[in-house]
Amino acid sequence: MSMSPKHTTPFSVSDILSPLEESYKKVGMEGGGLGAPLAAYRQGQAAPPTAAMQQHAVGHHGAVTAAYHMTAAGVPQLSHSAVGGYCNGNLGNMSELPPYQDTMRNSASGPGWYGANPDPRFPAISRFMGPASGMNMSGMGGLGSLGDVSKNMAPLPSAPRRKRRVLFSQAQVYELERRFKQQKYLSAPEREHLASMIHLTPTQVKIWFQNHRYKMKRQAKDKAAQQQLQQDSGGGGGGGGTGCPQQQQAQQQSPRRVAVPVLVKDGKPCQAGAPAPGAASLQGHAQQQAQHQAQAAQAAAAAISVGSGGAGLGAHPGHQPGSAGQSPDLAHHAASPAALQGQVSSLSHLNSSGSDYGTMSCSTLLYGRTW
């Protein structure tokens, strides 16, 4: 059996639709009710498909067509006249149609729906095509109880919806802050009076004051913690300024900075009137050295004078302090400490003159008036 049509159809819209129009015209001309089609429908339902199976039992192509004809014979088909009557609105004999469910059950149980193993080459399909494959509607009654159970179940308690946040105006916030600066806690009459002034409820005023008190306490706590942290960091920095012994040793071992006089600057000798940079520091250093030398000389002179006085006294033990004729100088020095002080002052005068000479020599070195 060839599946290709005998005549090819052009691809225009009018040529494609023309066969449908002709079939509708034929259906309209036939007319009639649904009585004759229903009789044909019932006869076709009871007709066994054995002739079609015997005709197409040879070959693979024959088996396919046998299944096709078997299905066509078992499944009820409506003729064109029945379709035309339905389309034209002739529904007078629709009451004679049997229910679809009964038709399906009768056709499934009868031999017209599934044959007794039409082809031995398809034994596996027969177990899927038994009478038990029909829809069992008796077990569907349990689904109705699910609806009753769902109705009897209590609805789950939904979470309470949070109220929308009320935003205060700038004037209300200003008045609340001004009153908070004056008084952090309000009594009930004061709260009601303030709420009536700014058009709020006493509960809103109460909650605002509670939140603002908590906010101010938290800010003060954060500020105190920040100050404490700054103090700790400052103390750590001050303690670090002293340094450990290793750092002190490193500073002591590092070379000192010594001021060096500048004799020539930019290829020209420096003038005597214009001291070079660092001259003041160098001059102060020279003065300090001169003072140290003078103090050392004073100490040495005092030690010498005291030693000579003691030796004189030990060499002449028989002499009394009154015998000033033999050694008047020694007696005078031993008797009066003021004389020793005068001698030390004379030595200090000499040292001061020596320091002046040192400063002069340093200045000559500094200003380039060299030797």
Swiss-Prot record:
Record localization: Nucleus
Compositional bias (Low complexity): 244-253, 272-294
Primary localization class, coarse: nucleus
Chain intervals for the UniProt region annotation (Disordered): 219-294, 310-339
Modified residues (Phosphoserine): S254
Recorded GO CC terms: chromatin; nucleoplasm; nucleus; transcription regulator complex
PTM annotation: Phosphorylated on serine residues by STK3/MST2.
Compositionally biased region (Gly residues): 233-243
Family as reported in the entry's similarity comment: Belongs to the NK-2 homeobox family.
Protein name: Homeobox protein Nkx-2.1
Organism phylogeny: Eukaryota, Metazoa, Chordata, Craniata, Vertebrata
Gene: NKX2-1
